[in-house]
Amino acid sequence: MKKEIHPEYVECKVSCACGNTFTTKSNKAELRVDICSNCHPFFTGSEKIVDAAGRVEKFKKKYAMQ
Protein backbone atom coordinates (compact mmCIF):
# COMPACT_ATOMS: atom_id res chain seq x y z
CA MET A 1 0.00 0.00 0.00
CA LYS A 2 1.13 3.52 -0.66
CA LYS A 3 2.00 5.57 2.39
CA GLU A 4 0.14 8.74 3.41
CA ILE A 5 -2.86 8.29 1.06
CA HIS A 6 -5.11 6.17 3.29
CA PRO A 7 -7.36 7.66 6.00
CA GLU A 8 -6.30 7.21 9.59
CA TYR A 9 -7.83 4.10 11.21
CA VAL A 10 -8.77 4.91 14.81
CA GLU A 11 -10.85 3.49 17.64
CA CYS A 12 -14.46 4.64 17.19
CA LYS A 13 -17.13 5.14 19.86
CA VAL A 14 -20.59 4.21 18.52
CA SER A 15 -23.60 5.68 20.35
CA CYS A 16 -27.14 4.44 19.72
CA ALA A 17 -30.38 6.37 20.28
CA CYS A 18 -31.38 3.74 22.89
CA GLY A 19 -28.35 4.67 25.02
CA ASN A 20 -26.16 1.68 24.17
CA THR A 21 -22.49 2.45 23.39
CA PHE A 22 -19.70 0.25 22.07
CA THR A 23 -16.32 0.67 20.43
CA THR A 24 -15.04 -0.48 17.07
CA LYS A 25 -12.49 0.69 14.51
CA SER A 26 -13.25 3.26 11.80
CA ASN A 27 -11.83 6.32 10.12
CA LYS A 28 -14.15 8.48 12.27
CA ALA A 29 -13.70 8.93 16.02
CA GLU A 30 -17.43 8.96 16.87
CA LEU A 31 -20.60 7.63 15.22
CA ARG A 32 -24.27 8.00 16.20
CA VAL A 33 -26.80 5.43 15.02
CA ASP A 34 -30.59 5.20 15.33
CA ILE A 35 -30.75 1.45 15.93
CA CYS A 36 -28.28 -1.18 17.11
CA SER A 37 -28.23 -4.88 17.99
CA ASN A 38 -29.31 -3.99 21.53
CA CYS A 39 -32.65 -2.46 20.43
CA HIS A 40 -33.31 -3.98 16.97
CA PRO A 41 -36.46 -6.20 17.00
CA PHE A 42 -34.68 -9.07 15.22
CA PHE A 43 -32.03 -9.35 17.93
CA THR A 44 -34.33 -8.67 20.91
CA GLY A 45 -36.93 -11.26 19.87
CA SER A 46 -39.81 -8.78 19.87
CA GLU A 47 -40.38 -9.00 16.13
CA LYS A 48 -43.91 -9.39 14.78
CA ILE A 49 -44.73 -12.33 12.54
CA VAL A 50 -47.27 -11.51 9.84
CA ASP A 51 -49.90 -14.18 9.26
CA ALA A 52 -49.72 -14.18 5.46
CA ALA A 53 -51.43 -17.55 5.12
CA GLY A 54 -54.62 -16.20 6.69
CA ARG A 55 -54.63 -13.23 4.37
CA VAL A 56 -54.22 -15.43 1.30
CA GLU A 57 -57.12 -17.65 2.35
CA LYS A 58 -59.29 -14.60 3.01
CA PHE A 59 -58.47 -13.23 -0.47
CA LYS A 60 -59.24 -16.55 -2.15
CA LYS A 61 -62.53 -16.87 -0.29
CA LYS A 62 -63.53 -13.29 -1.12
CA TYR A 63 -62.89 -13.70 -4.85
CA ALA A 64 -63.97 -17.38 -5.04
CA MET A 65 -60.61 -18.67 -6.25
CA GLN A 66 -60.86 -22.01 -4.45
Swiss-Prot record:
GO CC annotations on file: ribonucleoprotein complex; ribosome
SUPFAM superfamilies in alphabetical order: L28p-like
Positions annotated to bind Zn(2+): C16, C18, C36, C39
Stated name of the protein: Large ribosomal subunit protein bL31
Similarity comment: family membership: Belongs to the bacterial ribosomal protein bL31 family. Type A subfamily.
Cofactor: Zn(2+)
Cofactor detail note: Binds 1 zinc ion per subunit.
Gene, per the UniProt record: rpmE
The keyword Transcription is assigned to this record: no
HAMAP family (UniProt xref): Ribosomal_bL31_1
Entry keyword set: Metal-binding, Ribonucleoprotein, Ribosomal protein, RNA-binding, rRNA-binding, Zinc
Protein's job: Binds the 23S rRNA.
GO molecular function, one term: structural constituent of ribosome
Subunit structure comment from the entry: Part of the 50S ribosomal subunit.
InterPro entries, alphabetized: Ribosomal_bL28/bL31-like_sf, Ribosomal_bL31, Ribosomal_bL31_A, Ribosomal_bL31_sf
Pfam families hit by this protein: Ribosomal_L31 (PF01197)
GO BP terms in the entry: translation
Organism: Campylobacter jejuni subsp. jejuni serotype O:2 (strain ATCC 700819 / NCTC 11168)
The organism's place on the tree of life at top rank: Bacteria
